[in-house]
Design a protein with these regions (language model features):
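Structural signature of beta-strand start/N-cap positions in the alpha/beta core
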Residues: 7, 45-48, 69-70, 171-173, ...
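Active-site loop/oxyanion-hole signature of alpha/beta-hydrolase fold enzymes
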Residues: 7-54, 61, 86, 222
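Alpha/beta-hydrolase active-site loop signature
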Residues: 13-17, 78, 209-212
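Short glycine-enriched nucleophile-adjacent loop
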Residues: 56-66, 71
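Flexible "cap/lid" loop of the alpha/beta hydrolase fold
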Residues: 68-105
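Conserved alpha/beta-hydrolase catalytic His-Asp/Glu region
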Residues: 106-167
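Conserved loop-alpha-helix segment in the C-terminal half of the alpha/beta-hydrolase fold
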Residues: 166-208
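Catalytic histidine-centered segment of alpha/beta-hydrolase-like enzymes
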Residues: 208-221
Length: 230
């Protein structure tokens, strides 16, 4: 659906499976720098930028750099209230989850062949799984295992998340599922709502999980296209 309205560039983030490896010391600028290079290589000076979780946080960082015409952030990371240390527990869970999936990944296709396997595989990211192809879920499982989680988690745990919100001057829509088990609504959005981006267009998706693009793909696409068309 998005391709009918926009030229789509979908770069894989540094340190994520299928993307360039992390090189050098991890820093706040490392991943946004790489996305900017991908935009430059593709000829995009600015773009309507969409991201989920860490990708949503990166989208907002790119907006602060003046690279976004608009941003749609789906449950962006980094929104815990100042002083809320629970984000460290969340980051630790990502590392633990990767360890658990590493043992299961060689059997990904067999796991996803059953409805129960697909339900368990999506329990932290989506509330609706029946429509998601088994092949995609197997690919996602192997993708999680292929991420360089440890150095990114170590950096974020130590340094936290920052956003120069005053420099985010483009329109921003933030979409959050009320049944998000990884970044729970509304606590994981507190700093975005109260300090950084209270003026954003906020959309709550009742009963939806952490990855709306998997949970309700058509509605997610409509929320993106409807916002970029303004």
């Amino acid at each position: 659906m998005l391709e009918r309205h926009h030229d789509v560039l979908a770069p894989t983030l540094l340190g994520h499976a299928g993307g360039p490896p992390l090189q050098g010391e991890v820093s706040e600028a490392l991943i946004p720098d790489a996305v900017e290079r991908a935009m430059d290589d593709a000829g995009f000076e600015t773009a309507h930028i969409v991201g989920n979780s860490l990708g949503g946080y990166i989208a907002l960082q790119l907006a602060a750099r003046g690279r976004a015409e608009s941003v749609v952030a789906l449950a962006p990371a980094g929104g815990w209230a100042k002083g809320d240390e629970s984000f460290k527990e969340t980051l630790g869970f990502f590392a633990t989850m990767q360890d658990q999936l590493r043992a299961a990944a060689p059997h990904a296709e067999a796991i996803m062949a059953s409805a129960e396997g697909r339900r368990r595989a999506t329990q932290f990211i989506a509330t609706n799984f029946e429509h998601i192809p088994a092949e995609l879920l197997a690919h996602l499982m192997c993708g999680v295992v292929g991420c360089e989680v440890a150095p990114m988690v170590e950096y974020a745990t130590r340094e936290g998340y920052q956003l120069d919100a005053a420099k985010v001057t483009c329109p921003v829509r933030i979409v959050w599922g009320t049944d998000d088990k990884l970044l729970p609504w509304p606590s994981a959005a507190a700093r975005f709502r109260d300090d950084w981006l209270p003026q954003a267009d906020w959309v709550e998706l009742e009963g939806i999980g952490h990855c709306p693009q998997l949970d309700v793909p058509l509605e997610s696409a409509q929320l993106i296209v409807g916002f970029t068309a303004r």
